[in-house]
Amino acid sequence: MLPMLVFFACSKGGKDMHFGIISDTTIRLSADDTQAEIDIEANVDWAVTGGKDWCKPDVVRGSGDRKVKLTIKPNTTSGSRDVTLTVGSVLGSVDIYVEQAGVTTGYAEGAYKAAETNRQTNPVNIVIMGDGFTAADLEQGGAYDQAMDRAREAFFDIEPFKSYRNYFNVYYVYAESEDRGATYGWGYDGSTKLTFAFTERNTAFKATFSTSANSTATSCNYQKVFDYARKIPAIKVGADIVLKPDGNIQSGAISDVNNVINKTLIILVINDTRYAGTCVMYPTGAAIGMCPMSTAVGNMSFEATLRHEAGGHGFGKFTDEYIYYPGAIPQTDASGYSVNEIQQWQGLGFYKNMSTVKTKAGAPEEWQPFLDNAAIYPEVGFFEGGCTYALGIWRAESNSIMNDNVPYFNGPQRYFIYNRIKTIAGEAPTWADFRTRDVQATPSQLNAFTAMARANESGFIPLGRPIMMDMPL
């Protein structure tokens, strides 16, 4: 900034007199600045008045040219402060405005923090970050923190995550967007039956809702999400992750199934009220659950969406159990669910919540102990329909979170989640150990979930299928 020159001059008795300030008359300081100066040019007497305890001139009177030093105390408060000093002489006076900013209480772009640390050795890591939050939202305890806290509590407010919370470490990563919200390719919100115009918003991770009508599909800049997750030292292990333009794996740590990124769940909270959500999953285990902050209630709320996308798809590696089509699931289908696709993903440890055959021997291994203990788990069996088809595919219970977002993981789903938690933690999972901490739904709760499913048949909007990268077909 150029200095603001304020100058007075006159002649008296044949003598020229002058007085002026040749430095800036507005001084702006950061919270930790400790000095400033006022540059006086004069051949007359002058005086400085108006100082405060935190802003004191080194001299208050003088004559002639002088650079008056201002001693500034650091501002340890969050609020800014200001003072006006006046430099006066017989020729006139000049006000000097001094403003000092408060301590910055916001998080820096790209900063991270450990929000919850439960284990020092072999923790199960969750990284939560937000898109569509501006600088004003990144204040400590502000909208960004509140959204991350809400996501974290929603994730753990369901079994079995609730019982095994002490196995998890949770991190927040802070990202600043120019705009709030997300880009609307097609603005239909199934929860409100409203259609919004195409809107492009400048956000950190470019969260975008589908261009397809009536779709809840969501996408983002997956490369940048992984880059930000790896700002955390505990996650930044191995070579930099490089994805292809379409989001599939090119190289780096994500290629190694044993790398920590493939044992870490990433949740992207999108600062938009639309009901939508999608999980992108990689065959090596990495996953990003994209969850807008839906203002819908019940099974289409933000919390319900997050548990389905992040807890069910992202961590559990489950597929969808809802039904769109009245016929049988095809053997092959390049654009949708098929028997071949499900079986191949099951070979990689995914989609274990569905069975492509109605036989105990052919069902996923996580179902076996439940089928062997029908007296203890009478709710578990073969229930036809799932993966969008009514026939030729079976789920383990009448209803679960992977159907219509009810707050319930069924028995085999809980067992698979338990197995994954224990394995990541370096502990051996066993059926006996699982049974000691399993929180089984009561018959009345199960009846309520079934009733909820029937009630939702007309009004519930199922979330779109997950994005499966590097599909094995």
Protein language model features and the residues they cover:
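Bacterial Sec-dependent N-terminal signal peptides
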Residues: 6-26, 90, 95-97, 101-105
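N-terminal low-structure segments adjacent to metalloprotease catalytic domains
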Residues: 11-14, 102-199, 411-473
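Solvent-exposed, low-complexity, repeat-rich "mucin-like" stalks and linkers
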Residues: 12-15, 22-49
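Surface-exposed binding patches on compact interaction domains or structured appendages
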Residues: 17-20, 41-69
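A short beta-strand micro-motif common to beta-rich folds, especially ectodomain repeats
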Residues: 78-90
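Active-site-proximal segment of zinc-dependent metalloprotease catalytic domains
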Residues: 107-122, 129-133, 153-325
